[in-house]
């Protein structure tokens, strides 16, 4: 069902007309049918919300998820409200049965997982005891060789049982916590990181124009975070940025490009003025003056350059390299969270099932910080303001606080940065790259059970060729030589920006003593 309903927005704007769409058990809303291509402004799951009819206003109905979401709606007439109530109630009833079955299966799997975890702890204790016994036998010498053989056999048997139980834990976890639970995009909404594949061409454009169109981050009226951007425009924008790093093959025609903080581009020729900032036309005239060893036409950087192949990192909706720090190195909250969302799909390319726990942890922490942000967007414009607010309120160390969520979020981002750095530096073994990154970042914060789960996940890591192929926008691009150069170029932009912002957060947490040695 679809149609126009009035939604209460705030005390300033009051009731505003919105176009609602009920499909697949999800009620989503848009500014208008014509703006549906931009993606929904908000949505609510009918299976988990309460439908309340207003006691006085016979055109009003409220959809509520206690403590999370509140949709206050009004129809244009009593009859229209009745039609919506029937449709919403039917959708909720149809979903309840299947939801109950899924919850039952989820509970059973959770209980089985707890049982297996208890067995793991038991086997761990046995391993410790048997290792101590082995040490004693080894220290005593080889007087009784049979006893040494028996101890070794018993230790091997316990190790095999431990590994088998750990694998069963992973199988149960994979069955119960699939990656499909992480994102539920409302019908009609564009996917976050899906771009149309098209052959890249070099556009002839005025280079003095701004190369970056601001990405509009629309925080939904009900608190969800979404990114709105036109796919073709965004791909074109990223292509322009990438093209600035091409070099002309003509002799003595080296033209370098770099982005200013305001998004404009400065082109440097051989005869640049000392201030280094002139427009393209003046440089072309300088390069063409008599006395130069060679003459380049303005079009030469485009005509003679090699093919530019877009990668996952050059076509991200929002990137850490796009973020401009505010006053006192303030990290803008909305842009940072959107950049975090944009990098999460890297885990899907490593393995959507085995890395689901890591992905769920990252997404969960992003949502916790966002929930704090939307409570007061005017005040919490930077991450530092959120942390300092909780420090002053003495809730920074409270479990599930935004400060704690940001702590684990930056740890997860450090792991991803470490892994991508290994790949950029030429590591061809994905398992080795992951293991090195894990050892430098997350391992010290994990107990033996989580370390074992990660070790098991490493065994399912893809090959280098498969991982690189997953980072392409157009199938088969990874086989081209220009793709490797493109990856190096994009990561050289992306990783330093990411590292700079993580370093700022590290300093903030160190100053206020917010780092934790807690092991999970």
From Swiss-Prot:
GO terms for molecular function: ceramide 1-phosphate binding; ceramide 1-phosphate transfer activity; ceramide binding; glycolipid binding; glycolipid transfer activity; identical protein binding; phosphatidylinositol-4-phosphate binding. This is Pleckstrin homology domain-containing family A member 8. One of its GO terms (cellular component) is nucleoplasm. The modification Phosphothreonine is found at residues 139, 153. Residues 311-520 are annotated as: Glycolipid transfer protein homology domain. Residues 270-287 have a biased composition (Basic and acidic residues). The keyword Signal does not apply. Residues 1-93 form the PH domain. InterPro entries: GLTP_sf, Glycolipid_transfer_prot_dom, PH-like_dom_sf, PH_domain. Residues 255-268 have a biased composition (Polar residues).
């Amino acid at each position: 069902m679809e149609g126009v309903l009035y939604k209460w927005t705030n005390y300033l704007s009051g009731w505003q007309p919105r176009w609602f769409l009920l499909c697949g058990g999800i009620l989503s809303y848009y500014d208008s049918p014509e703006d549906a291509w931009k993606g929904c402004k908000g949505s609510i799951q009918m299976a988990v919300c309460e439908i309340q009819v207003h006691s006085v206003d016979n055109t009003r109905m409220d959809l509520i998820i206690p403590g999370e979401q509140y949709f206050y709606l009004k129809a244009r007439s009593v009859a229209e409200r009745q039609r919506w109530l029937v449709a919403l109630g039917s959708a909720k009833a149809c979903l309840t049965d299947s939801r109950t079955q899924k919850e039952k299966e989820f509970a059973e799997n959770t209980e089985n997982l707890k049982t297996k975890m208890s067995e793991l702890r038991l086997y761990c204790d046995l391993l410790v005891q048997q290792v101590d016994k082995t040490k004693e036998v080894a220290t005593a010498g080889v007087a009784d060789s049979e006893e040494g053989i028996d101890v070794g056999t018993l230790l091997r048997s316990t190790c095999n049982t431990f590994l088998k139980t750990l694998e069963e834990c992973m199988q149960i976890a994979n069955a119960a916590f699939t990656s499909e639970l992480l994102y539920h995009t409302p019908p009609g909404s564009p996917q976050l990181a899906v771009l149309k594949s098209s052959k890249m061409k070099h556009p002839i454009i005025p280079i003095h124009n701004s190369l970056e169109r601001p990405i509009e981050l629309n925080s939904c009226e009900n608190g969800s975070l979404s990114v709105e951007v036109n796919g073709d425009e965004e791909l074109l924008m990223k292509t322009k940025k990438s093209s600035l790093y091409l070099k002309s093959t003509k002799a003595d025609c080296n033209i370098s490009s770099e982005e200013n903080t305001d998004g404009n581009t400065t082109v440097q020729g051989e005869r640049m003025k000392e201030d280094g900032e002139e427009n393209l036309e003046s440089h072309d005239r300088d390069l063409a003056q008599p006395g130069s060893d060679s003459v380049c036409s303005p079009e030469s950087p485009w005509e003679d350059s090699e093919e530019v192949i877009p990668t996952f990192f050059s076509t991200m909706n929002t990137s850490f390299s796009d973020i401009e720090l505010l006053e006192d190195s303030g990290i803008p909250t909305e842009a940072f969270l959107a950049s975090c969302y944009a990098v999460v799909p890297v885990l899907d390319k490593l393995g959507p099932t085995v890395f689901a726990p890591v992905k769920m942890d990252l997404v969960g922490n992003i949502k916790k910080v966002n929930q704090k942000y939307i409570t007061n967007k005017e005040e919490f414009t930077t991450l530092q303001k959120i942390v300092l607010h909780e420090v002053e309120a003495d809730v920074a160390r409270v479990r599930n606080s935004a400060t704690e969520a940001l702590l684990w979020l930056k740890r997860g981002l450090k792991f991803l940065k470490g892994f991508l750095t290994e790949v950029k530096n030429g590591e061809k073994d994905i398992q080795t790259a992951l293991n090195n990154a894990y050892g430098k970042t997350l391992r010290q914060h994990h107990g033996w059970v989580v370390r074992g789960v990660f070790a098991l996940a490493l065994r399912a890591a893809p090959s280098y060729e498969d991982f690189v192929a997953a980072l392409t926008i157009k199938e088969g691009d990874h086989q081209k030589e220009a793709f490797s150069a493109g990856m190096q170029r994009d990561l050289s932009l992306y990783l330093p920006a990411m590292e700079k912002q993580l370093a700022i957060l590290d300093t903030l947490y160190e100053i206020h003593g917010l780092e934790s040695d807690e092991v999970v």
